[in-house]
Amino acid sequence: MEMQTNPEDQQAQLNRVESFGESLLRLRKEAIDARIASGIERIWLEDEEHYEGIDELNRGQERSAWASKPPGRSDPSRYQNRSIVFPNITRPYVDAAAAKIGDTLLPTDDKAWSLKPTPIPELMLIAEGNLPAPVQQGMEEVGVPPETQEQVAQIEAQEAARQIKEAKDRAAKAEQRIEDWHVECQFHAEMRRVIDDACKIGSGVIKGPVPALKRQQMFIDGMLVIKEEVKPISKRIDPWNFFPAAGCGDSIHNGSYCWERDYLTAKKLEELKSDPSYIASQIDLCIDEGPKKAGSIRKTTDGKDVDDKNLFEVWYFYGVADKEDLEAAGVEVPEGIRHIPAIVTFVNDRVVKAALSPLENGELPYDIFAYQRRVGAPWGTGVSRQIRTPQEMVTAGVRTMLTNAGRAAGPMMVFKNNVIPADGTNDITPWKVYYASDDDATDDARKLISLIQFPDLQGSLMNIVQFGMKLAEDVTGL
């Protein structure tokens, strides 16, 4: 960014940039608060837990971040003397759905799309030698000889055929170019990650196409040549790091803006100063301040909290900005435009870069793939949520069955008061010796100890498990 040389003008410019940033930060707070209020973050966390096979009872057995009890959850330590296994049917159903969608939309070594020119009925008729009726009628009215009419029809047919062929050739070349871009940016790999997110938590976020600088190294005539090109790419965005506009409804494109969160180390942030489009003085202030956090807790793709206290939060705003604000941030804005789509980058709530949107119409370069749409929300419902009730039924049935099996594995023993173990303990061991009092009237030792067998209910409990498995198939369609 080019700063003013006059100190007063320079300070005024920075003040304008700071004011510009504060106005956008209010929109960020609205977006963050709206997503929290929607309850979708709690749903994501619950869906991630079931995918990982974690719930209240077995949380303490997990050797990971899941072991910490989230707010509002019961303490697992109070559940004793019962089975805590988690028969995870959520993960295979989620993975099966993702594989099925991926194989359908992203076939291996092929593409699931093609480009063809739009058909023009009039042009197709002319290519077959049939002139439009008004043209044919006009030539007859002015007395054009039939031979001349035939020549005109042939010439027009040749021209129409040429245009049709040219359109097909252009479509084929455009298709090849787009496919080349997809291969270079690993579009299939990124989309499979988006599909995984959608099947797991209901929503997958894809960003693109957006311009990105690609560097290629090659040897030409024995010399190393480094070539830099700007090419369109698409990439997957973690749903935890995407914040659509508050009140956008069921489509993020109904909102006027959106925010994306990313993270940078201090080293990477320092390297941005070499880019003249960044405001170096603002970056220096950010590094001096240290990392600050503005959003909700960062999660990994499996929902665990991330230790990112040494990382700087980077926020990208996509929306409409005023001409004067962009010019204060060093952006050259065309004349005659007062409001223009822009991209503004924040670090530590400071504007470090502003640029015009590469899309002239201002369309947001994001899309949310919802596995099953929710009414009035851009987020979707995933397989993990669809199968939640069957998963709980299967889990409860298996745990009760195993608890029952453990209790039915051995009998309950009832001793009369005058029966005393020789070793002073009630442990059941071979060659155990007991003493019976001489005062006891019976001479049959078996009457001094009674065995009660706990009922084995595995058959009836397995019916509950089987019903849960059948219900899982019905609710998912898999």
Where in this protein do the model-derived segments appear?
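Extended, charged amphipathic alpha-helical segments
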Residues: 312-478
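Extended, helix-rich architectural segments
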Residues: 1-352, 457-460, 464-467
